[in-house]
Structures are given as C-alpha cells and as structure tokens.
Amino acid sequence: MSTWHLFSDSSGDGFRWEVAGRILQSVSDSTPTKALESTAPLPSMADLLLQGCSKLIEREESMPGEIPMFRTGLGKSVVLKESSIAKAKSILAENVAYSDLQNTNCSIPQTRQVDTAETMPMFRTALGKTVPLKESSIAKPLSILGSDMIIDSDNVLPRESGFGVPNSLFQTASNKKVNVSSAGLARAKALLGLEEDDLNGFNHVNQSSSSLQQHGWSGLKTHEEFDATVVKHHSGTPGQYENYVSGKRSEILNPSLKVPPTKFQTAGGKSLSVSAEALKRARNLLGDPELGSFFDDVAGGDQFFTPQKDERLSDIAINNGSVNTGYIAHEEKTSNKHTSNSFVSPLHSSSKQFRSVNLENLASGGNLIKKFDTAVDETNCALNISKPATHGLSNNRPLASDMAVNNSKGNGFIPRARQLGRPADQPLVDITNRRDTAYANNKQDSTQKKRLGKTVSVSPFKRPRISSFKTPLKKNAQQASSGLSVVSCDTLTSKKVLSTRYPEKSPRVYIKEFFGMHPTATTRMDYVPDHVRRIKSSNADKYVFCDESSSNKVGAETFLQMLAESGASLQHASRKWVTNHYRWIVWKLACYDIYYPAKCRGNFLTITNVLEELKYRYEREVNHGHCSAIKRILSGDAPASSMMVLCISAINPRTDNGSQEAHCSDNCSNVKVELTDGWYSMNAALDVVLTKQLNAGKLFVGQKLRILGAGLSGWATPTSPLEAVISSTICLLLNINGTYRAHWADRLGFCKEIGVPLAFNCIKCNGGPVPKTLAGITRIYPILYKERLGEKKSIVRSERIESRIIQLHNQRRSALVEGIMCEYQRGINGVHSQNDTDSEEGAKVFKLLETAAEPELLMAEMSLEQLTSFTTYKAKFEAAKQMQMEKSVAKALEDAGLGERNVTPFMRIRLVGLTSLSNEGEHNPKEGIVTIWDPTERQRTELTEGKIYIMKGLVPMNSDSETLYLHARGSSSRWQPLSPKDSENFQPFFNPRKPISLSNLGEIPLSSEFDIAAYVVYVGDAYTDVLQKKQWVFVTDGSTQHSGEISNSLLAISFSTPFMDDSSVSHISHNLVGSVVGFCNLIKRAKDATNEMWVAETTENSVYFINAEAAYSSHLKTRSAHIQTWAKLYSSKSVIHELRQRVLFIIGACKSPSC
C-alpha cells in the first residue's frame, strides 16, 4: 500500500503532496518525475483524502507545532497537530519507508524505516485492536494468486501507477488485490486481440511536464513511461531499478511468439484451455465487433493521433455530466485509435471545468477522421431529435456534454466511445458466467446511480455481435451529441434513477386533503388564461409551452429530449411513451389550474412540473416495474372484471381515420367512451341502459366511475396500451349493474378495498351481470331435474319422478340390449356356418374345432403353426364380433329413443331485498328468484332460509314481471353468509314456514304459497288436458270437525306436468289413500263455491312427503301426528267415509270437479 507525504514546495511558503512507496530512488534534477495513478477500482485511503480537496491550500502563517493544511466547507482553518499526523501515519503506514515531518518548515523530509520483520500493523478490528500480519501469511495468498509474483524487499515489480507495490491490477469483491503475472497479461492480450505494437502508439508523446509542475506536482510521468513508472524519492539511488523495469516493460509489451493457452471457466467451475490459434480463427470468423468497417481501407501505418509537440495532458477534458475524480484513467492505445484522458490534480476540483485539446500537428490521417465525422453525422440524423428550447430554462447555456463534444470536433478529434455508441466507463463483461469472478475494475463510476434489481451475467460469446465489448482499462467518458445524448446498449438496459420522489419518504398528500372541496365548488377563473382553458384530453398532447423571451416552443418532442439527457433509456421512453404520458400530465395539471384557480394561480402547468412528472412515471414504470390498471389488463396480468376506478376522458373518441362516431339511439348498445387511469387509456362500449344515462347527461367527461365485473372484447394476446388505443379494436364492455359513480377524490386504478354490494332493488333486468349483491333467502325449493329432449324441447321433473324415470329408462335399455344380443348371436352363427370358402388357415382350424365332437384331441395333434394361427384368428374374430355388437346396440338404442339422457340438476331460491334500519321511508322490498344450475354439494346442504348472503356471479334475465329472475352456475357463483352482527342492521324480512289448516286457509291471500299436512281421502286417475297430464287429489285434516261444517272440510289439489307419450308415471299413487301426507309449496287458488271446497295447485317447486321425519318437512311433523290421531278415532271414520262419497259424486257427474 502506498503512502502520501507532505513536502515543502520550491518557494518554501507552501506544501505539496507526494507519493512514497517501497522503491526509493534519488531525485533527478534535470528531468522532473511524474507518477501516474493506478487504475485499481478501489482507491486507497490516501486517494480518498486527496479527492476531497477542491482547491490549493492557501498559504498562511501557522503557530509553532500546527500546520494549517485543511479547511472546513465554510473555509474555516482546521488546526492539524503533529500528534494528528502521527496518528494518520500509524493508520496509513505499511512495511515500507515513510517520511516523518519534523517541523512545518522543512523542505526535505527525513525518512525513517519501520521495522516490520515480525509484525505489520496493517489491519485493525472494529474496536481498534491491531491485527498482526506476518510475511508467512502473505506467502499463502501469493502462492495461490501467482507463484511468479513473490514479493521481496529487494526486487519488486513496479506497476503502472508507479507505486512500489506488487502489480495488483485486479481486486476481488472483498477488496483483496490479485497479482497478475506477465504470462497472465499475455493471455489477456491474446484474449482481447491486442497486437504487439498496441501499446507502442504513445512513444511519440513528448515527456514534457511543465503544465503539471504549475500545480506543484513533480512525481508524474508521461504516457511513454506509464508502464514502467516508479516513485523516485530524495533518499534513493538514481537508476537503481532501471534494468529491472526495462526488462519487465519489454516482457509485457513484447511477449514471445509462443503464447500460453487462454483458460476459461464454465458455470460449474471447470477450466477450459483455448489456444491463441483458436482465438485468432474465432476473431477472423466473427470479425472485429468493435471497429466494423471503419479501418478497412486505411493503411496500417497510419496513426490517428500523433502529436509531435509538447502537450498538456491535463488540459484534455471529456465531460458527460459526471464529476471527475482524482484518478488518471489509463487506457490501452492501439495503432488505429487514440482516446485522450484528463488528469485532475488532487487539490483541484474539475467537475465543472471545460478544457480543449490543443492539437496542432496531426499525422496523415485526415481521410480517416472524415470517415469518423460522417459516421457521427449519420448517427445524429438517425436520432432525428432537435435541440430542446425549454420554457423557463436557459437556452444560451450549452450543456457540459455538448461543450466537450464541440471542443473535440473542433480539433478534428472524436472519442472512439462516441463513434461506436458504447459507454467507455464500465468494466469488462464477465465471460465465465460466474458471479464470483474478480475484475480489475468492478466498481461503477462514482457519478452513476446503482442499478436497481438483479443483474445477470451472460457470456459475450452468446450475445449478438452488436453487443458492446470493452476492456477493463477503457475509461472513456461518454460524449453527448449536439441534439440528444447517445444511449448505448448498456445504457438502455441500465436503470438510472431519474426521480427521487419515489419511493415516497413522507406520506403523500392527495387532492382531497390538498384542495378540500369539489372542483365545481369554485367558479372564478380569473387566473386561467384562454389557451389553458381550451386544453382537453383530445388535444393535450399537442400543447406546447411558449417562451416569452424567444420564439422557442417546448412540446412533447422537447420533453423526450430532456428525458434522454437525464439518462432515460430510449428503448423504454420512446416517442409514443412520452407523448402518451405528456398528454395525461398536461390534461391533469390544466384541470387543476382551471377548477382551482385561486389556489393554483397557474403554477401547476409548468415545464418543471411536467418534466418532474415524466421522471416520476419513468421511475415507477421502468425502474420499479409498476403497471397501471389498464396496462395490466391489456398485458393479461389482471382480469378486466376487477374493481377499478377510471375517468371518462372523451365521449365517442376518434377512430383511426379521425372521424367521429355518431351518437346512437336509446336502443343502441355500441356507443363508446374513452376511459383513462391517468397513465393510459382504452375505449369502452356501453350497454343499453348506460347509453340512456349518457344521453340524459348523467355521464360526462371528467366523471369518475367505479367499475366491477366488466368484460373485455377483441383481446386475444398481450397488447401494449399504446397499440391498443390506436387500433381501437379492444374495448371494455360496461353494464349498468357493474358501473357506479365514484367519489370525485377517489384514486384512479385498481381498488384495494372490498367493493360495496349492489342493492337488490337496484338490479336492472337488462343491465348485465351483477358482480355483487346482498339479499335475504326466504325460500329454498327442492332439487329439480331438467331433461333436454332436442328440437328446443325440455321437461322438468321432481327428484321423485326423476328417480322413477331413470329406473324405467334403464329397464327399457336392458330389455332392448338383451334382445339385440340374442338376435345378433344367432345371426353371427348362421353367417359363419355358410362361410365354407374361407381359405385362411386359422379360419379352417376354427371351423374344424367348432364342429368337432372332441376338439381337445384335435388340438393335441395340431402343430405349433396351426395353434398359433388358430389363436390369432380367434382373437380377431372376438374383437370384430364385440365391435359389431356394440355398434348394433348403440344404433338400436338411438332408434328407440333410449340413448344417453341430457339431464341437468338445478335448484331455485327465493330472495328478497333488504332495508336498513336507518331507512325511514316506505318499506317495499323487491323479490327475486335465483336458479342455480348444477349446484354444488355445499350449496345444497349449507344454504339456509332466513339468512342474509353476499352473492356473486348472478346474471339477471329479461322479464316484464315485478319479480326479478336471475340465474347462476354452481361452480362460478359465490354465496357468503353475512355475520349475525351485521344482519342486525337490517329490518326483518323472513316469515318462517308453518303448517296451515283448512280452518284458517281463508286468511291466506290468493296465489300465495303454503304448506299443509292432510289425510288423503281420494286419488283420482291421471288424464290429459291441453298438452298437460293432470291428476286430482282430495285431502282433509279434520280441523273443521269441531264446527260441524262438512262443506269446507275438503281440499282439492291439482298435479300437472307437460304431456309425454312415453311417460306412464303418475304423480300420486293410489296406494296413498288413507295416509297422512305433508305438502309443501302449494299455491292457493280460488275456492270452488259450487262444490264448497278449497282448491290449490302444484308447481315445479311443489313437493310432498310421506315421512314427516324428512328435514324439508320437519315443521309439519307435529301437525301430521295430530291428524293421524284424529283419523284413528271411531267418530272420524264416518266423516272420512262421507267425504269420500261426496268426492265420488262430484267425479261421477263429470271427469273434473271444475265442471
């Protein structure tokens, strides 16, 4: 490790810094020495201290024992005592000779040698405890990193920086230095394709250093000596290591022709050797990816940069907007190209200095320079972006990058990094596919932001040839063109932080908290200019900021250029991307200025705010990968049915040809509006009801809508929102049942909170699917089965009848199949007996064995070939027989109408709307019936009457009835019960089931459902009436016995189903006469006044139970027990007999009691 010492300057009034190392040499009076800095990526502590100094130490008198060398940021002197210097030397010192300042006025430092033979206090713990380091510990890593680089105190290979330390050009990730031998450098040169004279192009540079001496530096060498530089001290001997240095220099620059094989490592760590010949053939095959065709017609002896005069290298500055460090970036120079570097004094700050290259004499290379200028001009024309003229910004002050480029162009010099469009300040790409590989320069530039996210190392041999490839020593600063910064391939993939607003360091303030009122509450617009009032979402992308002091105008193109100069990637921040976001930002800020003029006062719609918004959006979308709601829907990452808040930005938006769609009538459903989430937009088609709301003025531009359960039309594959808005083929499908008005301050995008259910009373029958609603269950009807008979015919049966139909269907199928099989077997035998002409060997054997009396004896005498043919033929015969039989059976069943039945189970549920307890208005809840197709087992068993449920996935059906009819699929619908605590917030809605007796049947209104338990007096025969099969059942319950009225003791129940010719199943069996049966869900009809009896009829939802223990009829259990007790009484038998005779009399007069 090198150390820095203080020396008095020549005048004796000031001080200067110099480097001290292991190798001590005398100072040459005739030729001042120069020390070039190391290219190591991690500077030493001394380097860091030197970088912090921004100007020369001012000369001032100091007190004895104090050295006024450092100052604070405010310019205040910091007293530095000798004890502080001693403490610093104890930290920075190594096992080398370092100087000791005896007093502040000494001009020649006195050198003393530190004895480090046993211990070397180079490392310390976190608590400050010294960790001894012996030379034996150093020998171990040296043996691993390179046996030919053993360090001793007498013979040390000087590195390029001139420090007397090992040639540690590379460092590991933990800052451990890795020594590189000459053989390693030769392999690196063979890998990078360098020729023997690649480093000889700098021999023409003069060794003058007059400009550097002006700053008090005398320890720096010229480019000619950069590879063999040593630090010469006053106490050394001149020329002590000249022979050694010269030999090493020639060994590095002119290696032998026999280059050792280059070794690569695979991802698994396996070492592979590649010879120089193989690499040469690979380069010949792939071509030179860096130079292309620029040097095809240039003579090999031409030098691009051959200055003949004494030039000041420190005057060459290449500035790309970053702060220059105190390092000298060394670069390998080839015979065909040259890139100059700028040296900055450690005591000077050059972050804002612009210098020019004074090139007076150039070699014969003018033709080549013209080629480079032509290539750069073609690159600028390809970008086709003009220089920005921003409003509110200085148009006369050139950019730092432009100044550097202009200075370079003026001298006929264009940096090679700019020519090839690649950054020159980044390390070599990893070619081993290993993450633990150490590089010589593995740190990013100090002015670059750290890349966000994970980085991936990919072998450059697997990349396209257009990918950039550069050596670790290339440190060129990237130049900017006169119009737009050149963005290379590496810069496109980087994630440079443009905005510090995200992530937010403090809670964000939203418009409701900032403005505190609805936009329509303000009417004064005195502060809003006319051109701002005319801004709409349709023309916001064309808006430009005008500079009052000049005729410059700033629009979307200018902001694109600003983003690119800020470091944005043109791959992501494309022209379409910037124009789209510029449109929505301008429209939003203009709306703030228009609707809140008193508070905004025109300070929102400014260039600064627009640029900051663009940077913020780039940071979130590109660097952090955040996507808005519309972008996620179009990319397929989120369903369109998700709940989101969007804003109406335009009605009937423009199509591709710019024409406007005409307004549709009230019955039209293809009216489109443009919706935006603030970042992107897409079209949306309105249904019939929403179209009526639009025509009535209830939908307008600027209104926010809460959308849930929307559909997506025209979408097939992931699509960019910038392309979708142009094609206008993809649109959202909105319906009124899933579209609600949102609060004016609601945030756009997906909603994190749970959506509020739509009130059951607000559901429109033709308003599309209902995303979520809340209702109470009043009745759950039994499971029914619907069979589709073809030709749009179907029949609905109860569970009991369906079981009988299944049994009857299976019996008919079995009888038909048995008959077909018997006939088929006889037909097959007859056909086989007549097949005497079959010449196949297996068929002959089969026929012989079939007709033989003792086939076993014949088989015993057969040969192996005969048995094999017989077995094969028999297998074929059985398979053909089985296949033909199956086809015949299927055809016969199809002809007989006994094929597979298409039956779907379903259940009906009666719902009612809810009314809040806080509602003081009229309580008129709406009723509805939901049909669940293919209900799940959970829905069959867990749904309970009297509970409130949150339902999802219901679709209303068009109906003119006051009752709302909906349907749903069992697998797609969701039924979530509401908690009992929340259910208490609604008014009661449920009337529990209870048995009705004949004595109080008159209290029930007509067409109402009721349940009754009754004694079956008589079961009539089934008959057909107008395409329906009917059957009458007469029952009584004995409730009128105490009053002595016989006239009102009968109830006639009509069972009816659609007529079917093949159905011989009756509703009620005659065996039920004399039994007590429970009837549920009967409909009350008008009373038969002629025969003085009550009348009721059944529907598809009606059901009866013989067993009162059934769960569905449990409420009839007590009433059924009382009726059974009454029927067993002796007095009741006469009443039952009299009622039966009366029924027979009515039936005898006509076939129907209604006659």
Swiss-Prot record:
Which molecular function terms from Gene Ontology are attached?
DNA binding
Task: Please state what is observed when this gene is inactivated.
Answer: No visible phenotype under normal growth conditions, but the double mutants brca2a and brca2b are sterile due to aberrant chromosome aggregates, chromosomal fragmentation and missegregation during meiosis.
The residue ranges crossing the membrane are none
The SS bond pairs are none
Looking at the UniProt record for this protein, which Gene Ontology cellular component terms does it annotate, in alphabetical order? mitochondrion
Q: Does the keyword Repeat apply?
A: yes
The UniProt record lists the keyword Disulfide bond? no
Q: Which GO terms describe its biological process?
A: double-strand break repair via homologous recombination; meiotic cell cycle
Tissue specificity is: Expressed in flower buds.
Protein keywords: Cell cycle, DNA damage, DNA recombination, DNA repair, DNA-binding, Meiosis, Repeat
Q: Where are the BRCA2 repeats?
A: 63-97, 116-150, 163-197, 257-291
Q: How does this chain assemble?
A: Interacts with RAD51 and DMC1. Interacts with DSS1(I) and DSS1(V). Can interact with both RAD51 and DSS1(I) or both DMC1 and DSS1(I) in a tripartite complex.
Task: Tell me, in a sentence or two, what this protein's role is.
Answer: Involved in double-strand break repair and/or homologous recombination by mediating RAD51- and DMC1-facilitated DNA repair. Plays an essential role in both somatic and meiotic homologous recombination. Is crucial for the formation of RAD51 and DMC1 foci during male meiotic homologous recombination in prophase I.
What is the protein name stated in its UniProt record?
A: Protein BREAST CANCER SUSCEPTIBILITY 2 homolog B
Taxonomic lineage per UniProt? Answer: Eukaryota, Viridiplantae, Streptophyta, Embryophyta, Tracheophyta
Source gene?
A: BRCA2B
